[in-house]
Regions:
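A residue-level marker of the well-folded mature domains of exported/periplasmic proteins
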Residues: 2-3, 7-18, 26-240
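Predominantly soluble domains enriched in secretory-pathway, periplasmic, or organellar proteins
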Residues: 23
Length: 240
């Protein structure tokens, strides 16, 4: 990806494709965007990004390669994201040289990134399992000239426009806020609720939790009577 204009065009297409996949999965709504970027940047809706047929043809002629390093591949959401990326890369003539699943292990993801780097992809699309523990691996990938697009959260200490191109995300805070509002209205503004949440330092779920709690403040007669965190998705039902 030697040409800066072409890189921007390609990233625009990937950003649109990823957000479109999220929309199809029910994660993006045509409403006010409440979330902000990792440094407080205003979010931009996918509908503002559009490529011409000529630009798409230029991407196809580029002979680019890509790798996808997932944080976890064992649910429908991840499967939808992967399929959306694979379909879009195929349409653009971009070869996928690796798809990895860290199974929510930072150590595994670091190893995955190191393995992927040996394949020298032009593009890396990834969701960090742990924004701190994986940071050095992403920095090494950036230093090697790989263009990184993060999904949902970035790795800590990386600079936008220098170490990575963009963060593509659903409106996680907004989704949590909407969930709280729907629940509050359904209860008629009164009642007791229990909250189950993902108990880890993972920005997307933390933002949804924050949005839900903020929405609950609008319903002073609704009390969160108990909370239960979990770290193992397979054991969530048992903990409940």
């Amino acid at each position: 990806l030697g040409d800066s204009k072409m890189r921007k065009k390609l990233v625009g297409m990937l950003t649109t494709a990823t957000l479109l996949t999220m929309a199809l999965a029910g994660n993006v709504q045509a409403a006010e965007i409440r979330s902000v970027g990792p440094d407080g940047e205003a979010a931009v809706d996918a509908s503002t990004i559009e490529l011409t047929d000529e630009q798409i043809e230029q991407v196809k002629e580029g002979g680019y390669t890509a790798a996808i390093c997932l944080h976890y591949g064992g649910n429908d959401w991840s499967t939808s994201q992967q399929k959306g990326l694979e379909d879009t890369f195929k349409e653009l003539g971009i070869e996928i040289v690796a798809v990895t699943d860290a199974n929510f292990s930072a150590e595994t993801q670091v190893s995955n990134i190191e393995t992927v780097m040996a394949k020298k992809p032009d593009i890396l699309v990834s969701i960090p399992t742990d924004a701190t523990a994986t940071a050095d691996a992403y920095k090494q990938a950036a230093a090697a000239g790989i263009k990184i697009i993060f999904m949902d959260q970035r790795a800590n200490g990386l600079e936008a426009g220098k170490d990575y191109v963009s963060v593509v995300s659903a409106d996680n805070y907004g989704n949590g806020y909407a969930s709280g509002t729907v629940l509050g209205d359904a209860l008629g503004g009164k009642g007791k609720v229990a909250m189950v949440y993902y108990d880890a330092n993972f920005a997307p779920t933390n933002q949804r939790d924050e949005g839900f709690r903020d929405a609950m403040k609008n319903y002073p007669d609704i009390e969160i009577v108990t909370e239960q965190g979990f770290t193992d998705e397979s054991g969530c039902a048992e903990q409940g």
